[in-house]
Amino acid sequence: MNVSFGILAYNESDSIGTTLESLFQQSLFTETDSSYAIEILVVPNGCTDETAKISRVTLDKLVKQSAHANVSWQVCEVEQPGKSNAWNRYVHDFSNPAADYLFLMDADIQFLEPDTLRNMIHALETTPEAWVSTDIPVKDVALKDKKNVIERLSVSVSKDVQSRERWASICGQLYCARAAMLRKIWMPVGLPSQDGFIRMMVITAGFTSPMNCQRVVLAKPASHKFEAYINLHSLLAHEKGQVMGNRINNWIYSYLRDNCNQEQDAGSLIKRLNDENPLWLRQLIQKTIAEKGWWLLPQGYAFRRFKRLQGQPLQKIISKFPVTITAFLADLVVAVQVNQELHKTGGLGYYWGKKG
């Protein structure tokens, strides 16, 4: 079995070494298993620090020390910054054409279970209808016994396990996919939010079939941790990027629904548009904004957290109210800022999109 890891990195010199060390502590690397041929490709994109250099030094050391005898590695530097472009280059240009499975990873995560990677592969091996397997992303502050208000707010906006299973969520920090299926997908150049876009391409087969959430499976037990935003400014900036990215994605979905069919799926259409007119996404967004008018976000967005309290016991409502009202005020600020930013810039190039 051929397994490829694509680690997409943007100025991660402070974290890439720790992430690679955590990767090599996985049972996939610590146990001798001749049935796996593994490649690790780090893709620094637009980096201005020593991410590439540290990756080379660390990988050279770890591969020599690994119990697994069939591990290869390469650092593939990309001059143009942007996660979407780096994703396209890894999936379609850099990864082993013979790979059975592709892992996409961020460069600033650490694994919590030693068998996370094996279990993610196993989930696909035992679920024929699934294209992608995921794990549970855990914010580092969620592991703390005592949390301040901002940390509680950060944890509260994370989806629970049941929600991830119900909505077939994909976290771009880590997922495993059947290579043949993932290679049907192309990212629009400049796309600011990738997670939801990948999910939609998978569950609709590139807008050629009805939604099928069974194409995404949650591996168990499997999880990783990542550094959460713990100050108000960074938390708001992150939420702003997420909301903006989701809104842009919805506009793209509308365009793809109108233009995709059995003869032309979303992947082939996007590849053609990227090649013929790299500015097509910007032009689509500008056209959509002109048609929408002043307010661009869904009605009632800022009040969504209060709806979650409906039907809850009074005691639970009281206990959650301080966090809910804080989150509401944050949502209100984010909504206004996102609306302004979309009118001003179209939202492209705003957010690299590492953390959740």
Positions of predicted regions on the chain:
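Active-site nucleotide-sugar/metal-binding loop of Leloir-type enzymes
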Residues: N85-Y101
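A conserved acidic beta->alpha catalytic loop
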Residues: L41-V57, Q80, I109-Q110
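Conserved donor nucleotide-binding strand/loop of the catalytic core
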Residues: T58-N85
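Conserved donor NDP-sugar-binding/catalytic core segment of glycosyltransferases
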Residues: Q110-K147
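Terminal low-complexity segments of carbohydrate-biosynthetic enzymes
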Residues: A237-G356
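Short beta-strand-to-loop acidic/aromatic patch adjacent to the donor-nucleotide binding site
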Residues: A98-Q110
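A short, conserved alpha-helix in the catalytic core of glycosyltransferases
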Residues: M181, L191-P221
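Short, acidic, metal-binding catalytic loop of nucleotide-sugar glycosyltransferases
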Residues: E21-A37, K61
